[in-house]
Regions:
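Conserved acetyl-CoA-binding loop-helix of GNAT-fold acetyltransferases
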Residues: 79-92, 112-117
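Conserved catalytic-core motifs of GNAT/GCN5-like acyltransferases
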Residues: 101-103, 116, 121-137
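Conserved GNAT acetyl-CoA-binding A-motif
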Residues: 93-105
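Short glycine/proline-centered loop/turn elements that form peptide/ligand docking sites
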Residues: 83, 87, 108-111, 128-133
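Residue-level recognition of the GNAT/N-acetyltransferase active site
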Residues: 74, 78, 105-107
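Extreme N-terminal starter segment of soluble prokaryotic enzymes
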Residues: 1-3
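Acetyl-CoA-dependent GNAT
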Residues: 5-76, 87-93, 142
Length: 143
């Protein structure tokens, strides 16, 4: 598996994965396109397996912090360590003395476990954060 920076040509496959992983709250084509093309403070990493994009993570950078705004792995390839590889790559590339933040659905137990195992801590709850009304757990990891 190869982790690389995203390219404009990745948009269709990222959108396909996004819709399959988040059917009720998927980002739009325009939202994903912005993440891929607005490079001032954003970065998207993708992971390829057998020359096919199978997962991605989208980041936004601020002063002394990085926000993981979206991450997904093709549902047919989940639970085999791809998400962990992407997350570790993200964490390995955080600038020194920065913190990483993310929101995760309160009921997304596999993702919560992944983040806790990576060292993230719960710091807050955002009520009714997602379009379906589910709360988000805000998590932070200080480097």
């Amino acid at each position: 598996m190869i982790i690389r920076a995203s390219e404009k040509g990745d948009l269709a496959r990222i959108l396909q994965i996004e819709k399959s992983v988040f059917p009720n709250s998927a980002w739009t084509r325009a939202m994903i396109s912005d993440e891929l093309t607005l490079n001032v403070d954003r970065k998207t990493w993708v992971i390829d397996s057998n020359k096919e994009l199978v997962g991605y993570c989208m980041l936004r950078y601020g002063p002394n912090e990085v926000h993981l705004v979206n991450m997904a792995v093709d549902p047919s390839l989940q639970k085999i360590g791809i998400g962990k590889k992407l997350l570790n790559h993200f964490l390995d590339n955080i600038p020194k003395d920065s913190s990483a933040y993310l929101e995760v659905k309160r009921g997304n137990f596999p993702a919560i476990k992944l983040y806790l195992n990576a060292g993230f801590k719960d710091i807050a709850i955002r009520e009714d954060y997602y379009p379906d009304g589910e709360d988000a757990i805000v998590m932070c990891l200080k480097k």
